[in-house]
A protein has these predicted regions:
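A conserved structural/catalytic subdomain of Rossmann-like adenosyl-cofactor enzymes
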Residues: 5, 285, 289-516
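Alpha-helix initiation/capping motif
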Residues: 3, 145-148, 167-171, 196, ...
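Hydrophobic alpha-helical packing residues
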Residues: 90-94, 261, 400
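Conserved, well-folded catalytic cores of nucleic-acid-processing
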Residues: 20, 162, 181, 185, ...
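Non-catalytic, mostly N-terminal accessory regions of nucleic-acid modification and defense proteins
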Residues: 1-206, 210-211, 215, 273-282, ...
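Conserved S-adenosyl-L-methionine
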Residues: 193-299, 304-315, 320-325, 335-336, ...
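Conserved NTP-handling cores and scaffolds of large molecular machines
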Residues: 25, 41, 47, 182, ...
Length: 516
């Protein structure tokens, strides 16, 4: 079986399990149990592989807890960020799950122990609260303890039955792929709410490539509204690990999604010392402001997010927003995320941000912010995407690419709204579409009906309108008429009509003659 076939088979199996174990509970409400259990299995097997160190004679899960010395535990936590005793390993808990009458409390105790093992270590904040949404007492699992344990046992057995093979690098990828697949399907079924925490994989790939284009190495990559971390991890998938020197950084407002993002990092084999995901409102309580600026920023922020705006007089003096001289509209904070990203960008950096199209042509504060961005030569490219690419919205969104190292004062506009493949419920961006966009993004060449590099003066004269349709002429798909051929066809038709008229006259004359 090829790796592609293996992935496809695994995805079918895991989605079937996810639907089977949830029973009558909505999949969106049950996701943390399936995702959390997958994560529990991953960190157990990852930890066992580390302890065993390639010695096939050692089976960590078969050891007794009493053989673990304080030195072994201390060293493991410093390296892996957490500790799991043999008795707490996923395989052991899953094996006795069906007959364990205290399964729900045992799981809660194990998760608490894993989290607390990091207390006092550098990994404490990366591990703390990871299992907070895995509520073993929730009525979503059932009304009685027996019902709860039965549902939990079903989830454990289902995840235990997934065939990831031996725990090596290729199968580590399978864990990450399975997790991303689950998140993607949950997001697709959740509609709008799902779109707020997951960016479709192909769009993520395009955004990551735009942000890191031309870079032989970057210090770190950042997403100010990171959701489940899918955008950040696309950078890891697209580029060798050594290119991203100091790792992955992000901030997320939603507590459940924040935990999903941290789990996602571990599941993609990003060690605790190579990521920093923080919880909180990026616009009001930003993290990383005192850190070294980022060489790459990617983001798909929530659309039309509400900003405190005029209600918070301190924001206009905030170093992120003050240079523009105006705040983003209170009910549409899209440009607040753009200005935030710009302020965190290094002098060699590039940011690629998903934006709703309205911010590129509306007046008022948004027009003033566009003027600030264009006058200071920060806008490298605006790309319009096809409609219905994202979960939760059918609108065709755009990608705004900001740069602090442009070599000219032109702004590039790319109309990629026609690049998509129609699928059952959504449109999809293909690899060939991404290559087409990246090719013209790199060359900055003008392509009729697709891409145009526009001088600063032209954008300024157009009231700083950044709508692609203002600069890239849409292709006229109406049929081109050949006038000469049309005239020839008309002449032939007229001749034929005249002949038919003569034939009819002759027939009529013949009939009238017979009647006489």
């Amino acid at each position: 079986m090829t790796s592609t076939q293996q992935r496809a088979a695994l995805q079918r199996q895991i989605w079937a399990i996810a639907n089977d174990v949830r029973g009558a509970v909505d999949g969106w409400d049950f996701k943390q149990y399936v995702l959390g259990t997958l994560f529990y299995r991953f960190i157990s097997e990852n930890f066992a592989t580390y302890i065993e160190g390639g010695d096939e004679s050692v089976k960590y899960a078969e050891l007794t807890d009493s053989v673990i010395t304080p030195e072994v535990k201390d060293d493991a936590i410093k390296t892996k960020g957490y500790f799991i005793y043999p008795s707490q390993m996923f395989a052991n808990v899953a094996a006795r799950a069906s007959t364990n009458e205290s399964l729900n409390t045992d799981l809660a105790a194990i998760f608490a122990a894993i989290e607390s093992s990091a207390n006092g270590y550098p990994s404490e904040q990366d591990i703390k609260g990871l299992f907070a949404d895995f509520d073993t007492t929730s009525n979503r699992l059932g009304n009685t303890v027996k019902d709860k344990n039965g549902r939990l046992a079903s989830v454990l057995r289902g995840v235990a039955g997934l065939d990831f093979g031996d725990f090596n690098d290729s199968h580590i990828d399978l864990f990450g792929d399975a997790y991303e697949f689950l998140i993607s399907n949950y997001a697709a079924n959740a509609g709008k709410s799902g779109g707020e925490f997951f960016t479709p994989q192909q769009v993520s790939k395009l955004i990551a490539r735009l942000a890191m284009h031309g870079q032989s190495s970057i210090n770190k990559i950042y997403d100010p509204a990171c959701g489940s971390g899918s955008l950040l991890l696309q950078a890891k998938k697209q580029f060798d690990a050594h290119i991203i020197e100091d790792g992955f950084f992000g901030q997320e407002l939603n507590h459940t999604t924040y935990n999903l993002a941290r789990m996602n990092m571990f599941l993609h084999n990003v060690n605790y010392d190579k990521f920093n995901i923080e919880l909180g409102d990026t616009l009001i309580e930003p993290h990383f402001g005192d850190d070294k600026p980022f060489d790459a920023i990617v983001s798909n922020p929530p659309y039309s997010f509400k900003l405190a705006g005029s209600d918070d007089p301190t924001l206009i003096n905030d170093d992120r927003f003050a240079p523009a001289g105006v705040l983003a509209p209170k009910s549409k904070a899209d440009f607040a995320f753009v200005l935030h990203a710009l302020s965190y960008l290094s002098s060699k950096g590039r940011a690629a941000i998903v934006c709703f199209p309205g911010i590129f042509y509306r007046g008022g504060a948004e027009q003033k912010i566009r003027r600030y961005l264009v006058d200071n030569n920060y806008v490298e490219t605006v790309i319009s995407l096809a409609p219905n690419l994202f979960f939760g919205t059918t609108i065709g969104v755009s990608i705004l690419v900001l740069s602090k190292h442009k070599t000219d004062t032109n702004t590039q506009f790319i109309d990629a709204s026609g690049l998509f493949k129609k699928e059952t419920n959504n449109n999809a961006l293909l690899d060939s579409h991404i290559e087409q966009i990246m090719q013209v993004f790199e060359s900055k060449e003008n392509v009729d009906h697709f891409a145009q590099s526009v001088p600063f003066e032209q954008v300024a004269a157009n009231d700083y309108n950044l709508s692609i349709s203002s600069y890239v002429e849409a292709k006229d798909n109406r049929e081109v008429l050949d006038i000469a051929q049309l005239n020839a066809d008309l002449k032939t038709t007229v001749t034929r009509i005249d002949q038919l008229r003569r034939d009819i006259d002759a027939i009529v004359a013949e009939i009238e003659g017979e009647e006489l």
